[in-house]
From Swiss-Prot:
Domain VPS28 N-terminal: 1-108
Protein family (similarity comment): Belongs to the VPS28 family.
Keywords: Endosome, Protein transport, Transport
Functional note: Component of the ESCRT-I complex, a regulator of vesicular trafficking process.
Free-text disruption phenotype from the record: Death at the transition from the first to second instar. Morphological changes in MVBs and developmental defects in the compound eye. However, for the ligands and receptors tested, changes in their cell surface levels or their delivery to lysosomes have not been detected. In early embryos and during sperm individualization defects in actin cytoskeleton organization ocurr.
Domain of life according to the entry: Eukaryota
Annotated compartments: Endosome
Protein name listed in UniProt: Vacuolar protein sorting-associated protein 28 homolog
Annotated gene: Vps28
Length: 210
């Protein structure tokens, strides 16, 4: 029996250094997000998820797509279409959603409403992620919470007495009373995160009702 060459058992590396590894990781992230949006569109068409679940998930993934594509965009991939073609991704529904930059459940008003909704979704996710990572100083949280409150006030479909908006404004008021280096206690972080998760769920319900 002929012996196998030892070279056949050597590990094949896709990258030669940390920079190349980061490049491949970024491309893998973008590939996964585009594929996820494609599968989400199929799930919605087949009534596998509710419109509320779809709207929330799609808004989130469109925000993540923008961040991921910026990490990959270069001369080789000037557009998402070139990336999709290069890696032979079959994702027409995802590309349509990316071009429209809004869930199919949200009506188009020349991008004003959809842009504001995307900002709100992005800020909810950003603030909740910070709290989960124990980033709890006033100067790290207040700018994002202020932007969230401003965007919620700007979105005309949100009522003045909307509970989710009032919760965000309450926490903004609390942060405004703190010094820049002051930290939220463990109990405050837990309550803040609970209030944000509740507010985010209520916001998604409101989108579904439109």
């Amino acid at each position: 029996m002929q012996e196998q060459s030892p070279e056949l058992y050597e590990e094949v590396k896709l990258f030669r250094n940390a920079r190349e590894r980061e490049k491949y990781d970024n491309m893998a992230d973008l590939y996964a997000i585009i594929n996820t949006i494609q599968q989400l569109e199929k799930a919605y068409i087949r009534d596998c998820i509710t419109p509320q679940e779809y709207t929330a998930a799609c808004s989130k993934y469109l925000v993540q797509y923008k961040v991921a594509f910026k990490q990959v965009q270069c001369d080789e991939f000037p557009s998402v279409e070139t990336f999709v073609k290069k890696f032979r991704l079959d994702c027409p529904a995802a590309l349509e959603r990316i071009r429209e930059d809004r869930p199919i459940t949200i009506r188009d008003d020349k991008g004003n409403t959809s842009k504001c909704i995307a900002e709100i979704v992005s800020l909810f996710i950003t603030i909740m992620d910070k709290l989960r990572l124990q980033i709890n100083t006033m100067d790290a949280l207040q700018p994002d919470v202020k932007d969230l409150a401003d965007n919620m006030n700007r979105l005309s479909l949100i009522p003045e007495d909307f509970d989710a908006k009032l919760k965000v404004e309450k926490w903004l008021g609390s942060l405004n009373e703190m010094q820049a280096s002051d930290e939220l206690s463990e109990g405050q972080v837990r309550q803040f995160l609970f209030d944000l998760e509740s507010a985010y769920a209520d916001f998604n319900k409101l989108l579904h009702s439109q």
